[in-house]
Amino acid sequence: MSIRPLHDRVIVKRKEVESKSAGGIVLTGSAAGKSTRGEVVAVGKGRVLENGNVQPLDVKVGDIVIFNDGYGVKAEKIDNEEVLIMSESDILAIVEA
């Protein structure tokens, strides 16, 4: 996949997260709801500050992140794969191993 986000934008590939119902049944796909976790596949150069300097992003390619899946997050198909384009501010946390 070849895509380069601009400024503070981040490209994230959603990760399927397995979840269980209250009765212990494993839910996958649409029954589990959309995951708000994903892997960062591309990052922009950073946020341009008022003084013209560029503040680098905290996230990097390969990070697993938890994000706010709401207004401002745009889904796109690139090479038949769905990816999400979002600002770094839409990312709530980086999952550390």
UniProtKB/Swiss-Prot annotation:
A single GO BP: chaperone cofactor-dependent protein refolding
Keywords per UniProt: Chaperone, Cytoplasm
Subcellular localization, as worded in the UniProt entry: Cytoplasm
Pfam families: Cpn10 (PF00166)
Gene3D superfamilies with a match to the protein in the record: GroES chaperonin
InterPro entries in alphabetical order: Chaperonin_GroES, Chaperonin_GroES_sf, Chaprnonin_Cpn10_CS, GroES-like_sf
Entry GO terms, CC: cytoplasm
Subunit annotation: Heptamer of 7 subunits arranged in a ring. Interacts with the chaperonin GroEL.
Function: Together with the chaperonin GroEL, plays an essential role in assisting protein folding. The GroEL-GroES system forms a nano-cage that allows encapsulation of the non-native substrate proteins and provides a physical environment optimized to promote and accelerate protein folding. GroES binds to the apical surface of the GroEL ring, thereby capping the opening of the GroEL channel.
UniProt xrefs under HAMAP family: CH10
Entry protein name: Co-chaperonin GroES
Source organism of this protein record: Serratia proteamaculans (strain 568)
